[in-house]
């Protein structure tokens, strides 16, 4: 798959003129999150201290979810900002928008429409980044990656917390093999999504950044102050724990010692990786790892439904159609 994505990246660049190859045209879908103006300013504004060159947001599809207040109350304002401040052209359909861009970012705060929004992008063979949450259900997560694999289109997803400097250092081997990690983040719940998909995904993403794949089961409980606590068992006796809290913190332990993790280092590192993936066709996070991350969070919900019983990831993946 990696070779396929790399070849696709080369074909993408070859199809562009020298001028456009230096500046990819980005289309955004779903203008109802603060990530929209933040990412656009990083890409379109050379005066931004975190400016990422090589791409520009030029087109967008408004989107929005009437039944989610944080979407309905902000989509018009963010759309106005993109048009008036950055000169972004708004299209009435995703199918029309993709004709005018080289790559796409799905930013809709609501994960439920992500599959439907991804389908025309994948059909048009445009490299795609999907902001958190990748989807509104584990079943949709699996289907997005299935469609991407069949089409040979690079598709990936990540929280910006994955690219905190401390977490990346541990992932790169600063502690050797990680045997234990715990992370925290806010975990506000949106009733239309599994509990951790909405915001707890941030801390869970950090956990998987340092632990990697291999989680076999989870048990969900509560902390002493009544917050969410999820304990995951990894192959080889390794343990990873997510806890709901106000801040982004964590600790990783490995063969060479331990180190704090979890700090938020801004959006720019994530945007850098997104543009790099668009340019090369090589995704920085495998579908296998992202699927396991969402299975971890789905299993946490199933554990809650069963009163804190241990639930395997294999079980929830099978139920979701894998």
Q: Positions of the model-derived regions?
A:
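N-terminal glycine-/serine-/threonine-rich beta1-alpha1-beta2 phosphate-ribose binding loop
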Residues: 5, 21-124, 150, 313, ...
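Glycine-centered short loops/turns at secondary-structure junctions
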Residues: 125, 152, 307-308
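A contiguous active-site-proximal alpha/beta segment in oxidoreductase catalytic domains
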Residues: 134-193
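Short helix/strand-capping hinge loops at secondary-structure junctions
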Residues: 125-127, 132-133
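Bacterial N-terminal signal peptides
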Residues: 7-15
């Amino acid at each position: 798959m990696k070779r396929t994505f790399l070849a696709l990246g080369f074909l993408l660049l070859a199809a562009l003129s020298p001028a456009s190859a230096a500046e990819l045209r980005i289309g955004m879908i779903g203008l109802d999150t603060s990530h929209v103006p933040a990412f656009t300013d990083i890409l379109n504004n050379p005066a931004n201290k975190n400016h990422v060159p090589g791409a520009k947001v030029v087109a967008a599809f408004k989107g929005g979810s009437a039944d989610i207040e944080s979407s309905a109350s902000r989509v018009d304002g963010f759309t106005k900002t993109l048009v008036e401040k950055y000169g972004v052209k708004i299209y009435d359909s995703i199918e029309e928008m993709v004709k005018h861009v080289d790559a796409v970012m799905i930013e809709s705060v609501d994960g439920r429409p992500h599959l439907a929004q991804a389908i025309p992008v994948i059909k048009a063979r445009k490299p795609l980044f999907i902001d958190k949450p990748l989807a509104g259900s584990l079943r949709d997560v699996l289907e997005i990656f299935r469609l991407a694999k069949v089409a040979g289109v690079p598709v990936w997803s990540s929280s910006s917390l994955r690219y905190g400097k401390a977490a990346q250092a541990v992932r790169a081997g600063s502690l050797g093999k990680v045997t234990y990690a715990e992370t925290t983040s806010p975990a506000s719940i949106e009733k239309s999504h599994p509990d951790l998909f909405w915001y707890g995904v941030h801390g869970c993403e950090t956990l998987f950044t340092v632990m990697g794949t291999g989680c076999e089961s989870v048990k969900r409980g509560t902390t002493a102050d009544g917050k969410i606590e999820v304990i995951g068992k990894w192959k080889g006796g390794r343990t990873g724990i997510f806890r709901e809290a106000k801040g982004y913190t964590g600790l990783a332990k490995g063969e060479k010692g331990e180190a704090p993790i979890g700090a938020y280092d801004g959006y720019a590192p994530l945007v850098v990786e997104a543009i790099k993936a668009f340019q090369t066709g090589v995704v920085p996070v495998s579908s296998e790892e992202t699927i396991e991350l969402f299975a971890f969070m789905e299993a946490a919900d199933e554990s809650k439904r069963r009163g804190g019983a241990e639930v395997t990831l294999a079980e929830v993946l099978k139920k979701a159609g894998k």
